[in-house]
Amino acid sequence: TVRAILVTHCHADHSPLAAWLSAASGAPTVAFGPHGDDAWDIGEDPVVHEPENDSASADDPATEPAEPTEPAEPVVEESTDRDFVPDLVAVTGDVVAAADGWVITGLHTPGHTSNHLCFALDDGEVRTLFTGDHVMGWSTTVVSPPDGDMAAYLDSLRVVAGRRDDVAIPTHGPPIPNPSAFVDELIAHRLERERQVLDAVRGGLATIPEMVEVLYAAVRKELHKPARRSVLAHLVKLVDDGTVVVEGSTRPRLDATFRPH
């Protein structure tokens, strides 16, 4: 018997079949909510002549965490399922399914998307966290503005690291034993990339394409387009932190010029 259909977020490889399964089974869909509104215009990518691989994305292809798994391929960047609306809305701590001896609760983890929801299973013996795309077993996660938010992503990673679950089950990649240690590495990796972006701005690199050419020099050119989205995500956080300024704009854009504060 299908009791509930748990949806982590509404990218096209996650939510589109949920309504069909709900109609076939009679079980409700459960999620944090529909896709968030785009908060601002991130502008057009200023690089127009470059090899492209539309099926691939590099959230940070140059320095992926080495343990416990090493990614073999770039992350697939999903399109958004803007038609998805859950039957039931769940937030952190809400019980979404339960029976004798086990319970599943929601854990809101914005960052990859604003509506990303993990699901925690506790059967009294093993604490399992279904992490969706928030923590993946084969690569780091795409954080692509405007719906993707690096500051929120880091905060959500810290929440997961502090839970001390026994195992994490991602939607991409193998199960992750000792997920807290794995997530600590993800946090360190992102903060190191943030430091590199800040150093690049302080060193006189003013545009995102310039930064990507330096920071991702060892990465295939067809991955530079998604890498620019990742650098933008870091710059959004640095601007909000007050360490970087956008020239002539209130919000960072792909085609903006940046300088140190």
Would you name each region that the model predicts?
Residues 2-3, 167, 197:
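Basic nucleic-acid-binding alpha-helical/helix-turn surface characteristic of O6-alkylguanine DNA
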Residues 8-14, 112, 172, 234, ...:
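Histidine-centered divalent metal-coordination motifs
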Residues 26, 164-165, 205:
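Residue-level detector of structured alpha->beta connecting loops
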